[in-house]
């Protein structure tokens, strides 16, 4: 198997930065060695957000965004390589998820579109890149998401303890690691996405640090009930969603029924939406003894406190306490998925995505052999 050092790259639905992780990976271990977060320029972030909310653009504009984002990913990887004094031949491959701008896994022509030209990353770094992870699963009848539960199973499953892993990025997703049962998982709904969108529009802040603003407000129960009446929350698994659905336009449509609300009350209610929609799915799935939380939302003390309050009898903690950085989990997962692709191993879990069969995922963008001798 192609063991060695891999790099994972993930920007996520929150667009709060490009996470880059270096790890040593083989069939027995995933050992994180270094990481960094690379900033996304505001203009690029806003252009991506506009696409995700359905704003029309020309093919030329889409092509330019694809190249610019790929170049940014390449710069982020180079920064990590320079930080760790690494050369191209030291890295087997880079696993790059890309930036999802549209995810529509149902209908006549199911699809998922990520941008961030992987050729740009290869050209800048001299390292082979593995990308386009989702579309094979969709071609096999799956949702193409979530893909991270397979990684959660490999690292965090316990032989006796009922565990669930909760990733709170822009979207929140659950992985159910129940002994003796196939792994299941799906997107529960918005994680940080709506909270971040609201504070960005209201206060031009990227996120609500330590939930300081939300703590100034109060939960508006009728508004929360309106949020939760969206059909996505009651839809059966397998299911997945993204910014093309839960975006600022969605929030505006709900708020139109409640004119004059204080902005901080809306923020407090969005925190409660995230916590309630997650906890309901945990309970509907039979509950767990330990809920291991990762992603940006694990750093939100109000979200964590509400989850603990809504899930009595469950130990709500972070993956950091299990030895895996919650901030780097998704980037690490795509480094691991790149390893599986290079090794010719299946990367999806049909019990999670609904695909007809397990499959090797992704496309390989090989580096020039003179650069990449791994």
UniProtKB/Swiss-Prot annotation:
Which SUPFAM superfamilies does the protein's record reference? Answer: Actin-like ATPase domain
Q: In which pathway does it act?
A: Amino-sugar metabolism; 1,6-anhydro-N-acetylmuramate degradation; Cell wall biogenesis; peptidoglycan recycling
Keywords (A to Z) from UniProt: ATP-binding, Carbohydrate metabolism, Kinase, Nucleotide-binding, Transferase
Q: Name one GO biological process term.
A: 1,6-anhydro-N-acetyl-beta-muramic acid catabolic process
- Write down the EC number: 2.7.1.170
Q: Name one GO molecular function term.
A: phosphotransferase activity, alcohol group as acceptor
Q: Which reaction does it catalyse?
A: 1,6-anhydro-N-acetyl-beta-muramate + ATP + H2O = N-acetyl-D-muramate 6-phosphate + ADP + H(+)
Q: Where does ATP bind?
A: 12-19
Its family?
Answer: Belongs to the anhydro-N-acetylmuramic acid kinase family.
Q: What does this protein do, in the record's words?
A: Catalyzes the specific phosphorylation of 1,6-anhydro-N-acetylmuramic acid (anhMurNAc) with the simultaneous cleavage of the 1,6-anhydro ring, generating MurNAc-6-P. Is required for the utilization of anhMurNAc either imported from the medium or derived from its own cell wall murein, and thus plays a role in cell wall recycling.
Q: What is this protein called?
A: Anhydro-N-acetylmuramic acid kinase
Q: What is the species listed in this Swiss-Prot or TrEMBL entry?
A: Enterobacter sp. (strain 638)
Give the gene name.
anmK
